[in-house]
Amino acid sequence: MSVVMPVPDAGVLARREEIVDALRAIVPGEGVIATEREMRPYESDGLTAYRQLPMVVVLPATTAQVSGVLAYCHAHGVKVVPRGAGTSLSGGALPLGDGVLLGMAKFNRIREVDFENRVAVVEPGVTNLAVTRALEDRGFYYAPDPSSQIACTIGGNVAENSGGVHCLKYGMTTNNVLGLEMVLMTGEVIRLGGKHLDAGGYDLLGIVTGSEGLLGVVTEVTVRILQKAECARAMLIGFSTSEDAGGCVARIIGAGIIPGGMEMMDRPAIHAVEEFVHAGYPLDVEALLIVELDGPQAEVDHLIGRIEAITRDCGAVTCRTSSSEEERLLFWAGRKAAFPAVGRISPDYYCMDGTIPRAQLPLVLRRTRELSEKYGLRVANVFHAGDGNLHPLILYDSNKPGELDRAEAFGADILRLCVEVGGVLTGEHGVGVEKRDLMPAMFSEADLAQQQRLKCAFDDKGLLNPGKVFPVLHRCAELGRVHVHAGKVAFPDIPRF
């Protein structure tokens, strides 16, 4: 493991049997897993390069059980890591050897659908795609659609503020969540927002969405649902260079056109996807844009014409528009399968997640190719071009000594480049453990200290998902008093209070 996690608390480990018995009293039946063999599936999330067995796994089924588990752990100084489906690509659900892994998979019911108010109330273990499937017979859907939507859960989406291919027009999770029920580390249950469109007081709902499981455990989510557009068509636009494709993205948005989705892939990704899905992608191009327009038929036809004119000016070598709903879905099936497709051409890959201003796409793509040559590792680029959210897939072989370290260094340089050109370290995958030690590249010590003060207002003992997001010490009394550089403190052996 290349990342450093908090040192296990020997006192907690010595009380393991006592803790397990207490948790079994709160979550009876098969809700507590404590054997190594049965805990093995929980040792990592989607960032499988890092693995660690938890001390114990707890699978509650009710808000009362979640409250009981957290209250007990708070009183007895036991760390807790919440987990949805374990699809996080930043190590956000990486367990702790002296902590409880709190799995929310049993919270899998859609409690209510209110078509008149256009909201649905769901439990956090419901998968993203299941929400849309429950609505589609009535012509509605849930807009955020991460590539992992068949597996990722709404609770995990809230934790990471997930987006997807249609977030350019319809927003991230934070733009589509209206209310939450959440359990604090003390066991207290609070409600934020609701079916109404606004709430008085501080925007705590906005603070919790994207907080990566550091502030509380979500047990219910009220989401906004949308009616399907009258018409939707997708365009495949090929270019001879990635720079031309990146320039076209900026031109389309600059013309005042906001597509339903705008994705980009480079040559390695195009070939991997086409071999895997047979989506009809052109193989003689260096970069491919997928642009979707939705709305009234006349508006869609008009926008397609405008985009065709822009692509000609930008040097597109091919432009094709879907002629049926089946073909539109096939275009998107290729993009949705990009990650597993790339997984077929390399033993391992390391997926990055930075966001940049759209106008910087050509520069960043060129610099990424230079970094690829520097580190001697191939990279396949797949990303949400419309909002500048990059997902470079760094190809490596973990069986070769040193390749994971090179992939990590390559990825860190990409993220530093994103910040350098005015972007941010993450778009939708979260910070987790993966980007934790890069936070000082983007935030000052004062920035990070203020964020930790907010964390301490929700979790005064620092027991909820520790070791994630912040590259500094986790105790509230030390905030602002310890110099941190590159995630390390001076005199680390000095006892802390």
Which positions does each model-derived feature cover?
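N-terminal flexible segment immediately upstream of the FAD-binding catalytic core
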Residues: 1-71, 87-118, 267-278, 324-351, ...
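A glycine- and small-aliphatic-rich helix-loop capping segment at beta-alpha/alpha-beta transitions
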Residues: 90-108, 136-140, 163-174, 221-227, ...
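C-terminal substrate-recognition/cap domain of FAD-linked oxidoreductases
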Residues: 33-43, 223-227, 233, 238-241, ...
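Activity-critical C-terminal alpha-helical subdomain
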Residues: 188, 437-497
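FAD-binding subdomain of flavoenzyme oxidoreductases
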Residues: 109-263, 464, 481-485, 489-497
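Alpha-helix capping/hinge segments and adjacent helical runs
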Residues: 28-29, 419-431, 454-456, 460-467
